[in-house]
Swiss-Prot record:
Belongs to the GlnD family. Modifies, by uridylylation and deuridylylation, the PII regulatory proteins (GlnB and homologs), in response to the nitrogen status of the cell that GlnD senses through the glutamine level. Under low glutamine levels, catalyzes the conversion of the PII proteins and UTP to PII-UMP and PPi, while under higher glutamine levels, GlnD hydrolyzes PII-UMP to PII and UMP (deuridylylation). Thus, controls uridylylation state and activity of the PII proteins, and plays an important role in the regulation of nitrogen assimilation and metabolism. GO terms for molecular function: [protein-PII] uridylyltransferase activity; phosphoric diester hydrolase activity. Has four distinct domains: an N-terminal nucleotidyltransferase (NT) domain responsible for UTase activity, a central HD domain that encodes UR activity, and two C-terminal ACT domains that seem to have a role in glutamine sensing. GO terms for biological process: regulation of nitrogen utilization. The lineage of its organism: Bacteria, Pseudomonadati, Pseudomonadota, Gammaproteobacteria, Pasteurellales. NCBIfam families: PRK01759.1 (NF002487), UTase_glnD (TIGR01693). This is Bifunctional uridylyltransferase/uridylyl-removing enzyme.
Length: 863
């Protein structure tokens, strides 16, 4: 043993606790001095010695017909600092009262020492009966390892679990694969979530265990080395699995050393500490990102090889007696029982461009897969390539052909990524494989996100997508050639991690790619523009005032034409949806639809003049009047006009006819001082909070504090002040998950806002610390946009999205006598990226001195 415990001849829980702590300290101090396998072996030896000594001291070794058997991870000798001690006490017959007491004493002692114990007491008959009924018990028994006691009795157990009538090889295989399918579903079928589980995520240690279990049930192979010697895996597969296993072991061991309670999740705060223990260096996030890149690449290799070998077992062992049906596809490919196979194992080495045809055939035959033998030949061929596939003219032609095939992304590009073909084709791809960004916004690695953007684009094709993405569906389904959009998606983030502006660098890369692949000048320019501008629509819709004609004109000028607007709309929506499933909601849909429609109108009108919103104002008035006449026949035109004359024209531009009619129906006969109403019926994409009252100090502060305290997300705030000093305030909110607010929650918020607005006190902030935010720093940044505007000032704020941020900002506005006219609230992971339209106390744009003062106060107070 590397670590020799100094346990006395008479064990006590306190002495064992001290030795456990000494062992942990030894491991921390020597983590980089020994191989991870030596550390795990050493810990297992420590447990073996402890349990055997305890077994003897309690007197169980003196009993006949009773044995101590390690099972589970302990049986495999995979013991990490916080692993459970799983063991079986095997008895020949039901224990006597005396033996039961000794067993209880044995287990209680281990609990008193602080161990997490998983134990069972069974006879051989019980092992057989319960093992047949429960695949988990059966698996534990397969991994059983003798510690002490009656060895012949253990040998009988070993023979029992190998019998075909215990679990047949096929039944055992199917049950374990079904467990894997269910586990993958829990993790959304991806290893690339940014807070992964080392054990259970796809590609994690459980995938290795599945491989062990299948081999163990089939041939009795207990280790990876034994599986290699059996010929079931190739030497290069063994080498990759061994390296990946060693890295995951190191990460898990380090994680357990820094935790107090058992957990295998690499949460953000833990990633920092684990990367330090593993020796990754770099200021700030790079060290974590380097470690996680290695981690995700290990997951990918394990997932690829273990699933390939499981498929190989199914096809070559379990299905070996199946009738063979062969369909010849061409000189090099054939279908054997609905699996794509090579007719000659050297095809890919001799004609590497044919690798692309393998995936072309996947798009042509919806229900076929690639045979495991062909996949293994593919892996061998990729390792032997002397050049990138894109350097081969025939491969370039085949690569471009894939984009316009049915289900090209799902059936060709996703598998090409999975099997390493994209890395073999694109020089830049390897740099983003497994590349995470240490933030809360991007929940997938860059390569996984990229494929999800492409897959989302493909999902715009079916008619069923029209409800959620009406504009993107209409555009994408009408494109005769979708190649440019798919290529733009493939390259939009390809330059991340290099430093510099990834959009600019990516634009250069995609232009080089397009030129190499023979695209014409117009296509090259369009691709470069799409990649360079892929964030422009998102920024404009979410962080600019899209009701400002100058904003629309500037955006239209950047688009240049309808085709580019259409392309960028599809790419932007797909990018948002593929970044984080919670980002896209009905409010976002309405924002992007409005910007798209305004830009279309600008193109239609011509680019010489700004959009004339007076026509929109007049039309909204007219439509609102029609709604009121139809739905509220008791309201007179005179009373409507009396109310509307109090409102600035801006009110009729920024609200829909339905909203205007709703507000009017509430206010024409209203004589009270305060009105708070919340509805889902009249606002596009969110729940509208409408507030009418006399303007008062801290109004915005009170509203946002109350909404935040009730756990809602604020997306938009619109402050309209009438000529006589009343406010028509509208806030668009949703639940935190993006859903509309249900009736009971709306009534609750109405009451809370009414109380807050009637009180002279500011509401107390309910601040619940966010675990994830504690480990991020965001530099507070203030930017003033379009400083030449005279009527108002536009300000953009970037800061850590901590609780109470909006209330804090509004308090600053109040202290500096600033009026808030409009706000857009955007959360980007741990960052708040908020947009405000302000005037000073005289209703004018802020002077330079006022802007400098505001900037100084925000930077000072918001950290």
């Amino acid at each position: 043993m590397l670590f020799s415990p100094t346990l006395s001849s008479l064990l006590t829980p306190s002495a064992v606790k001290i030795e456990r702590e000494n062992l942990k300290q030894f491991e921390l101090e020597n983590f980089s001095c020994y191989s991870i396998f030596e550390l795990i072996e050493n810990r297992c030896d420590f447990y073996d010695a402890l349990l055997i000594q305890l077994w003897q001291e309690i007197g169980l070794s003196e009993q006949q017909g009773i044995s101590l058997i390690a099972v589970g991870g302990y049986g495999r000798r995979e013991m990490f600092p916080l692993s459970d001690l799983d063991f079986l006490i095997l008895v020949e017959q039901t224990p006597s009262h005396e033996i039961e007491e000794k067993i209880t004493q044995f287990i209680q002692f281990l609990w008193d020492c602080g161990f997490e114990v998983g134990n069972s007491v069974r006879t051989l008959e019980q092992c057989e009966l319960e093992g047949k009924q429960d695949i988990t018990i059966a698996t534990n028994l397969l991994e059983a390892r003798f510690l002490t006691g009656n060895r012949p009795h253990f040998d009988v157990l070993n023979e029992l679990v190998k019998r075909a009538d215990f679990w047949s090889k096929e039944d055992f295989f199917n049950a374990k694969v079904q467990e894997q399918i269910e586990r993958y579903q829990r993790y959304h079928n991806t290893a690339y979530n940014l807070e992964p589980d080392i054990k259970f995520s796809p590609g994690g240690l459980r995938d290795l265990h599945l491989l062990y279990w299948v081999a163990l049930r089939h041939s009795g192979a207990l280790t990876l080395e034994a599986i290699l010697q059996s010929g079931f895996i190739y030497p290069q597969e063994y080498q990759q699995l061994q390296e990946s296993r060693a890295f995951l072991f190191k990460v898990r061991f380090a994680l357990h050393l820094i935790l107090k309670r058992y957990d295998n999740r690499l949460l953000f705060d833990r990633q920092i500490k684990v990367s330090e223990l593993l020796g990754f260096r770099g200021e700030g996030n790079p060290a974590v990102e380097k470690m996680m890149k290695c981690f995700f690449q290990a997951l990918h290799r394990i997932s690829l090889i273990s699933n390939l070998l499981i498929q190989h077992y199914r096809e070559n062992v379990l299905s070996s007696n199946q009738d063979t049906v062969i369909d010849q596809l061409d000189d090099d490919f054939q279908l054997i029982n609905q699996s794509l196979c090579l007719r000659n194992s050297f095809v890919f080495q001799e004609k590497p461009a044919r690798i692309l045809d393998l995936f072309f055939y996947l798009t042509q035959y919806e229900h076929v897969n690639i045979h495991s033998d062909t996949l293994r030949q593919l892996q061998i061929s990729l390792e032997q390539l002397s050049q990138k596939l894109c350097e081969i003219p025939a491969a370039r032609e085949k690569f471009l052909r894939l984009f316009n095939q049915s289900n090209a992304i799902k059936r060709a590009f996703m598998p090409m990524h999975q099997y390493g073909v994209l890395t073999a084709y694109l020089p830049q791809w390897q740099a983003i494989e497994g590349l995470m960004q240490f933030d809360l916004f991007h929940i997938y690695t860059v390569d996984e996100h990229t494929l999800r953007v492409m897959l989302k684009l493909e999902s715009f094709l079916p008619k069923g997508s029209a409800q959620e993405h009406p504009i993107a569906h209409r555009i994408f389904s009408q494109l005769s050639d979708r190649t440019l959009l798919y290529i733009a998606a493939l390259f939009h983030d390809i330059a991340k991690g290099r430093g510099g502006d990834h959009a600019e660098l990516g634009a250069e890369d995609v232009a080089d790619f397009a030129q190499l692949h023979g695209l014409d000048r117009r296509e090259i320019d369009t691709l470069a523009w799409l990649v360079q501008s892929h964030l422009l629509m998102s920024i404009t819709a979410q962080r600019r005032d899209i009701h400002d004609p100058e904003v629309v004109m500037n955006f239209a000028e950047a688009m240049q034409n309808q085709v580019r607007l259409d392309y960028l709309t599809c790419l932007t929506v797909a990018d948002i949806c593929a970044t984080n499933g919670n980002l896209w909601n009905s409010w976002k849909r309405s924002l992007f639809a409005s910007l798209y429609e305004f830009t279309e109108q600008q193109f239609s009108q011509g680019m010489k003049e700004l959009l004339d919103y007076s026509e929109k104002s007049a039309e909204n008035r007219k439509l609102a009047q029609q709604i009121l006449t139809q739905d509220y026949s008791d309201i007179t035109s005179i009373s409507i006009e009396k109310l509307w004359t109090r409102c600035p024209e801006d009110y009729f531009v920024r609200n829909t006819p339905k909203q205007i009619a709703w507000h009017t129906s509430l206010l024409v006969d209203f004589v009270e001082a305060l009105l708070v109403k919340i509805s889902n019926r009249f606002s596009l994409g969110g729940t509208e909070v409408f507030i009418y009252c006399q303007d008062q100090p801290h109004l915005f502060n009170k509203v946002v504090s109350t909404i935040g305290a009730k756990k809602f997300s604020i997306h938009d705030a619109q402050i309209i002040t009438t000529q006589d000093g009343y406010v028509f305030d509208s806030f668009i909110i949703t639940e935190l998950n993006g859903e509309l607010v249900e009736f009971d929650r709306r009534r609750e918020l109405e009451q809370a806002l009414t109380v807050a607005l009637q009180s002279e006190k500011l509401p107390a902030l309910s601040i619940v610390p966010n675990r994830q935010l504690q480990h991020f720093t965001v530099q507070t940044d203030v930017r003033f946009l379009q400083e030449n505007k005279k009527e108002h000032t536009e300000m953009e704020l970037v800061a850590l999205d901590k609780a109470g941020l909006l209330a804090q900002v509004s308090q600053i506005f109040t202290e500096l006598n600033l009026n808030l006219l409009n706000a857009k609230i955007t959360t980007v992971g741990e960052k708040a990226e908020d947009f405000f339209i302000l005037t000073n106390q005289f209703g004018q744009a802020l002077a330079r001195e006022e802007r400098e003062r505001l900037n100084s106060v925000i930077i000072q107070q918001i950290r």
